[in-house]
Design a protein with these regions (language model features):
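Extracellular acidic loop/turn motifs
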Residues: 39, 52-56, 120, 164, ...
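Short, well-ordered coil/turn elements that cap or connect secondary structure elements
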Residues: 18-19, 43, 80, 131-132, ...
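Short loop/turn motifs at secondary-structure junctions
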Residues: 1, 42-45, 54, 122, ...
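Short beta-strand elements of solenoid repeat domains
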Residues: 4-6, 48-50, 57-59, 66-71, ...
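GD-rich hexapeptide-repeat beta-solenoids
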Residues: 2-38, 95, 99-162, 208, ...
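Signature of short aromatic-glycine-proline-rich micro-motifs recurring in repeat-based ectodomains
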Residues: 42-48, 162-173
Length: 238
Protein backbone atom coordinates (compact mmCIF):
# COMPACT_ATOMS: atom_id res chain seq x y z
CA UNK A 1 0.00 0.00 0.00
CA UNK A 2 0.83 3.67 0.09
CA UNK A 3 1.53 5.00 3.58
CA UNK A 4 1.43 8.60 4.80
CA UNK A 5 3.35 10.21 7.65
CA UNK A 6 1.55 13.42 8.65
CA UNK A 7 3.31 16.25 10.53
CA UNK A 8 0.71 18.91 9.77
CA UNK A 9 -1.19 19.06 13.07
CA UNK A 10 1.53 19.00 15.72
CA UNK A 11 4.20 21.68 15.18
CA UNK A 12 3.22 25.32 15.68
CA UNK A 13 5.14 28.54 16.13
CA UNK A 14 4.35 28.40 19.85
CA UNK A 15 5.72 24.91 20.41
CA UNK A 16 9.24 25.05 18.95
CA UNK A 17 12.30 27.27 18.98
CA UNK A 18 13.65 28.23 16.52
CA UNK A 19 10.64 28.44 14.20
CA UNK A 20 11.88 25.86 11.71
CA UNK A 21 10.01 23.02 10.08
CA UNK A 22 10.70 19.33 9.71
CA UNK A 23 13.57 17.74 7.82
CA UNK A 24 12.69 14.31 6.42
CA UNK A 25 14.80 12.15 4.11
CA UNK A 26 12.94 8.99 3.08
CA UNK A 27 16.14 7.54 1.60
CA UNK A 28 17.65 7.50 5.09
CA UNK A 29 17.16 4.04 6.61
CA UNK A 30 18.82 4.85 9.92
CA UNK A 31 17.95 7.30 12.65
CA UNK A 32 17.42 10.90 11.57
CA UNK A 33 16.69 14.12 13.42
CA UNK A 34 13.34 15.16 11.97
CA UNK A 35 12.74 18.02 14.41
CA UNK A 36 13.52 18.89 18.01
CA UNK A 37 9.80 18.51 18.71
CA UNK A 38 9.92 14.83 17.68
CA UNK A 39 13.51 13.97 18.48
CA UNK A 40 15.24 11.17 16.57
CA UNK A 41 13.10 8.98 14.32
CA UNK A 42 13.57 5.94 12.11
CA UNK A 43 11.23 6.13 9.10
CA UNK A 44 10.76 2.91 7.13
CA UNK A 45 8.11 1.79 4.65
CA UNK A 46 6.68 5.29 4.14
CA UNK A 47 6.02 6.70 0.68
CA UNK A 48 4.15 9.95 1.39
CA UNK A 49 4.84 12.90 3.69
CA UNK A 50 2.59 15.74 4.83
CA UNK A 51 4.77 18.60 6.07
CA UNK A 52 4.18 21.07 8.87
CA UNK A 53 3.00 24.68 8.63
CA UNK A 54 6.62 25.89 8.90
CA UNK A 55 9.61 25.80 6.53
CA UNK A 56 10.14 22.10 5.76
CA UNK A 57 12.69 20.06 3.81
CA UNK A 58 11.21 16.81 2.49
CA UNK A 59 13.10 14.34 0.30
CA UNK A 60 11.59 11.28 -1.35
CA UNK A 61 13.02 7.79 -1.85
CA UNK A 62 12.16 6.81 -5.42
CA UNK A 63 8.93 5.00 -4.47
CA UNK A 64 6.39 7.16 -6.33
CA UNK A 65 6.17 9.64 -3.47
CA UNK A 66 3.54 12.27 -2.78
CA UNK A 67 5.12 15.10 -0.78
CA UNK A 68 3.00 17.94 0.62
CA UNK A 69 4.89 20.94 1.97
CA UNK A 70 1.90 22.59 3.64
CA UNK A 71 2.24 26.21 4.68
CA UNK A 72 5.69 27.79 4.93
CA UNK A 73 8.60 28.08 2.50
CA UNK A 74 9.36 24.43 1.76
CA UNK A 75 11.91 22.47 -0.27
CA UNK A 76 10.51 19.30 -1.88
CA UNK A 77 12.98 16.90 -3.52
CA UNK A 78 11.40 14.11 -5.56
CA UNK A 79 14.65 12.16 -6.16
CA UNK A 80 13.31 9.71 -8.79
CA UNK A 81 10.23 7.70 -9.87
CA UNK A 82 6.83 9.28 -10.57
CA UNK A 83 6.21 11.86 -7.88
CA UNK A 84 3.54 14.37 -6.92
CA UNK A 85 5.02 17.42 -5.19
CA UNK A 86 2.61 19.95 -3.65
CA UNK A 87 4.07 23.15 -2.23
CA UNK A 88 1.03 24.66 -0.53
CA UNK A 89 0.91 28.26 0.66
CA UNK A 90 4.38 29.82 0.74
CA UNK A 91 7.40 30.32 -1.51
CA UNK A 92 8.49 26.77 -2.25
CA UNK A 93 11.37 25.16 -4.15
CA UNK A 94 10.87 21.96 -6.16
CA UNK A 95 13.47 19.48 -7.37
CA UNK A 96 12.00 16.75 -9.51
CA UNK A 97 13.67 13.41 -10.02
CA UNK A 98 14.05 10.93 -12.86
CA UNK A 99 10.48 10.07 -13.78
CA UNK A 100 7.08 11.50 -14.67
CA UNK A 101 6.45 14.20 -12.08
CA UNK A 102 3.47 16.42 -11.32
CA UNK A 103 4.35 19.56 -9.35
CA UNK A 104 1.85 22.02 -7.88
CA UNK A 105 2.99 25.38 -6.57
CA UNK A 106 -0.09 25.83 -4.41
CA UNK A 107 -2.80 23.21 -3.85
CA UNK A 108 -3.86 19.94 -5.41
CA UNK A 109 -6.95 17.78 -5.74
CA UNK A 110 -6.57 14.01 -5.62
CA UNK A 111 -9.40 13.80 -8.17
CA UNK A 112 -7.53 15.54 -10.95
CA UNK A 113 -4.46 17.38 -12.17
CA UNK A 114 -5.73 20.96 -11.97
CA UNK A 115 -3.97 23.05 -9.35
CA UNK A 116 -5.83 25.83 -7.54
CA UNK A 117 -4.14 29.19 -6.95
CA UNK A 118 -4.94 30.23 -3.38
CA UNK A 119 -1.95 32.41 -2.45
CA UNK A 120 -1.06 35.30 -4.76
CA UNK A 121 1.72 36.76 -2.61
CA UNK A 122 4.17 33.85 -2.53
CA UNK A 123 6.48 32.74 -5.33
CA UNK A 124 7.51 29.20 -6.17
CA UNK A 125 10.73 28.10 -7.86
CA UNK A 126 11.53 25.07 -10.00
CA UNK A 127 15.23 24.36 -9.51
CA UNK A 128 17.33 22.75 -12.26
CA UNK A 129 20.64 23.96 -10.86
CA UNK A 130 21.94 20.40 -10.44
CA UNK A 131 21.00 19.32 -13.96
CA UNK A 132 23.88 18.94 -16.39
CA UNK A 133 21.93 18.47 -19.62
CA UNK A 134 20.08 21.12 -21.59
CA UNK A 135 16.52 22.01 -20.56
CA UNK A 136 13.65 23.27 -22.70
CA UNK A 137 11.15 24.93 -20.37
CA UNK A 138 8.01 26.84 -21.34
CA UNK A 139 5.92 28.72 -18.78
CA UNK A 140 3.77 30.44 -21.39
CA UNK A 141 0.60 28.38 -20.81
CA UNK A 142 -0.88 30.71 -18.17
CA UNK A 143 0.93 30.08 -14.85
CA UNK A 144 1.94 26.51 -15.56
CA UNK A 145 5.24 25.13 -16.76
CA UNK A 146 5.21 22.84 -19.77
CA UNK A 147 8.20 20.71 -20.67
CA UNK A 148 8.99 19.78 -24.21
CA UNK A 149 10.09 16.26 -23.45
CA UNK A 150 13.29 16.21 -25.48
CA UNK A 151 16.26 13.94 -24.83
CA UNK A 152 18.00 16.90 -23.25
CA UNK A 153 15.47 17.29 -20.44
CA UNK A 154 16.85 16.48 -17.00
CA UNK A 155 15.03 16.94 -13.71
CA UNK A 156 17.54 15.09 -11.56
CA UNK A 157 19.23 17.44 -9.09
CA UNK A 158 22.16 15.17 -8.33
CA UNK A 159 24.32 13.09 -10.70
CA UNK A 160 21.77 10.86 -12.44
CA UNK A 161 19.85 12.07 -15.49
CA UNK A 162 16.11 11.53 -15.83
CA UNK A 163 13.88 12.05 -18.86
CA UNK A 164 10.25 12.24 -17.77
CA UNK A 165 6.96 13.65 -18.95
CA UNK A 166 6.46 16.35 -16.36
CA UNK A 167 3.58 18.70 -15.56
CA UNK A 168 3.99 21.72 -13.30
CA UNK A 169 1.28 24.14 -12.15
CA UNK A 170 1.35 27.52 -10.39
CA UNK A 171 5.12 28.02 -10.36
CA UNK A 172 6.38 31.50 -11.15
CA UNK A 173 10.19 31.29 -11.20
CA UNK A 174 12.81 29.04 -12.80
CA UNK A 175 16.52 28.40 -12.27
CA UNK A 176 18.39 26.71 -15.11
CA UNK A 177 21.19 24.19 -14.87
CA UNK A 178 24.68 23.94 -16.33
CA UNK A 179 23.45 23.00 -19.82
CA UNK A 180 22.43 25.29 -22.68
CA UNK A 181 18.83 25.92 -21.60
CA UNK A 182 15.81 27.47 -23.28
CA UNK A 183 13.57 29.14 -20.68
CA UNK A 184 10.32 30.88 -21.65
CA UNK A 185 8.23 32.92 -19.22
CA UNK A 186 4.46 33.04 -18.73
CA UNK A 187 1.94 35.88 -18.83
CA UNK A 188 2.82 36.95 -15.29
CA UNK A 189 6.02 38.54 -14.00
CA UNK A 190 8.62 35.77 -13.78
CA UNK A 191 12.10 35.57 -12.33
CA UNK A 192 14.17 33.39 -14.68
CA UNK A 193 17.86 32.65 -14.15
CA UNK A 194 19.63 30.73 -16.89
CA UNK A 195 22.52 29.57 -14.73
CA UNK A 196 25.67 28.44 -16.51
CA UNK A 197 26.23 27.88 -20.25
CA UNK A 198 24.75 29.57 -23.34
CA UNK A 199 21.05 30.01 -22.59
CA UNK A 200 18.04 31.47 -24.39
CA UNK A 201 15.66 33.35 -22.06
CA UNK A 202 12.39 34.84 -23.30
CA UNK A 203 10.18 36.96 -21.02
CA UNK A 204 7.01 36.23 -23.04
CA UNK A 205 3.82 38.00 -21.83
CA UNK A 206 4.61 39.10 -18.30
CA UNK A 207 5.29 42.76 -17.47
CA UNK A 208 8.19 43.42 -15.12
CA UNK A 209 10.12 40.17 -15.50
CA UNK A 210 13.56 39.69 -14.01
CA UNK A 211 15.68 37.84 -16.58
CA UNK A 212 19.20 36.76 -15.60
CA UNK A 213 21.62 35.22 -18.05
CA UNK A 214 24.20 33.92 -15.61
CA UNK A 215 27.54 32.80 -16.97
CA UNK A 216 27.85 32.06 -20.68
CA UNK A 217 26.99 33.65 -24.02
CA UNK A 218 23.25 34.17 -23.48
CA UNK A 219 20.38 35.53 -25.54
CA UNK A 220 17.77 37.37 -23.44
CA UNK A 221 14.54 38.83 -24.82
CA UNK A 222 11.77 40.77 -23.08
CA UNK A 223 8.40 41.47 -24.67
CA UNK A 224 5.90 43.83 -23.02
CA UNK A 225 8.35 46.11 -21.26
CA UNK A 226 9.30 46.87 -17.69
CA UNK A 227 11.73 43.94 -17.57
CA UNK A 228 14.97 43.89 -15.63
CA UNK A 229 17.66 42.14 -17.68
CA UNK A 230 20.99 41.07 -16.24
CA UNK A 231 23.48 39.67 -18.72
CA UNK A 232 25.96 38.20 -16.27
CA UNK A 233 29.57 37.34 -17.10
CA UNK A 234 30.66 37.00 -20.75
CA UNK A 235 27.12 37.25 -22.08
CA UNK A 236 26.33 38.01 -25.68
CA UNK A 237 22.93 39.36 -26.70
CA UNK A 238 20.61 40.98 -24.13
Amino acid sequence: GSDLLDFSATISNDSVTPYSGIKVDLEQTGTQRVHDYYGDMTILGIENIQGSNLNDYIKGNGQNNTLWGGAGDDVLDGVSANNILVGGIGSDTFRGGAGDNIIYGESYSTLGEAGTETDTTSRDLIDFSGAGNSIILNLSNFTSINYKDETTLSLEAQTSIGYGKNKIYNVEDALGGSGADTLIGSNIANVIDGGANNDIIFGFGGVGNTLIGGTGNDTIMGLLGGDKIYGGTFDGTT
